[in-house]
Amino acid sequence: FKIALKKVKMLLRKNPEADFISISQNDVPERCHCKNCKALEEKYACSGAPVFWFADKIARAIKDEFPKVAVEILPYVYSDEPPKGLVFSENIAIRFTTMNFCREHQLTDEKCKYNLKQKANLDGFAKLTNNLYIWDYAANFYNYLMPIPQLYSLYWNFRYYMEKGARGIMVQASGASDDGAFDRMWNYALGKLLWEPYMD
C-alpha cells in the first residue's frame, strides 16, 4: 500500500491539473487467488473486492491533499459485480464497463436474462457513488470487419445510463480499420447520440 500511495501522490503532484487517477485491474481475465484476496472476496461478496478495497484505501489517503481528484475504479470482466458492505469514499469514481453486455438487446429488455444480470450490476454500482461513468463498446473485437447490430440497443442504453446518474459515457469503437463495419458512419452516429441521448 505504501509504495502505491507514494507513486499516486508523486503522479498527482507532477500533474496538478489531473481530475482522476485510476486504480484498476489489469486487462486480463484472471485475478489473484492468494488467501488475502480470497478473504476480501468473501467479505464483500464479489471478485473485484481486492481492487475496490485497495482503491478505496488510496482514495481515503489522498483526499485531504488532493480534494478535487477522484480515484477511479473500473468494474471490468470478472469484477463487474458490486461489493456488498463496502462503503466507498466520496472521492471514488466508478467507470462501469459494458464488456459483458449482450449487444443484441437493450439493457432493460426483460427477455434477455443475460442483460438483466448486467443491469442489476450497474444499478448496484450506481448506488455506491455520485461519480458514475460508463465505458461502453461499439465494435466486434474478434473480427473488426463483421457488422455489430447494436445501434438500437446503444440508443436505449445511453438513456438508461443517464437515468442512473452517469456523468459521462465513453464508447470504444473500431479504429483499427477504415473499411470495417461502416466505422465512419458508426462514429458519426455515436457522436450525435452521445451529444444528445434523448434525440428522436
Where are these predicted regions, by residue range?
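Active-site groove signature of glycoside hydrolases
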Residues: 5-41
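Substrate-binding groove of N-acetylhexosamine-processing glycoside hydrolases
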Residues: 13, 41-200
